[in-house]
């Protein structure tokens, strides 16, 4: 079975309902996902932090770009889904899942970039945390909801 954004979202939704209190709005537009990876530049071999991986739509594109991904996810149902859908990448070490709140869980120390589709309600506090931690990153790509961008 070939993975795509719509399939990953549908498989997660078959397991559980979307939790709007966690800001779970899943991105399925593969043109947007692809463009965000292209905008990030060459991620091959780079350690990328993804925040709020949800069903793995962005994760899929990061892995296809040969990034090494550490993905933080607060929702245990999404973690279980990711373990099922990306078991070979987890086994190979290309993907590490971190269950917890991105506002408080320790970030991996050796990340090169952050690429994330971040939930609206943590957008400002997350940006503040990254600025406070003075991380030395080659690139940060945040996909945000239109309301936050305005």
Language model: regions and residue ranges:
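Catalytic cores of RNA-modifying enzymes
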Residues: 1-150
């Amino acid at each position: 079975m070939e993975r795509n954004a719509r399939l990953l979202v549908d498989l997660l939704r078959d397991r559980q309902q979307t939790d709007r209190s966690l800001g779970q709005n899943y991105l399925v537009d593969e043109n947007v996902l692809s463009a965000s990876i292209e905008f990030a530049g060459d991620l091959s071999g780079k350690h990328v932090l993804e925040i709020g991986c949800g069903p793995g739509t962005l994760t899929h594109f990061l892995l296809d770009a040969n990034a090494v991904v550490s993905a933080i996810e607060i929702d245990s149902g999404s973690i279980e889904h990711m373990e099922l859908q990306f078991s070979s990448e987890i086994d190979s070490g290309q993907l590490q899942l971190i269950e917890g709140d991105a506002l408080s869980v320790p970030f991996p120390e050796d990340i090169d970039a952050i690429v994330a589709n971040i939930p609206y309600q943590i957008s400002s506090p997350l940006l503040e945390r990254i600025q406070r931690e003075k991380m030395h990153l080659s690139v940060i790509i945040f996909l945000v909801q239109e309301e936050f961008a305005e």
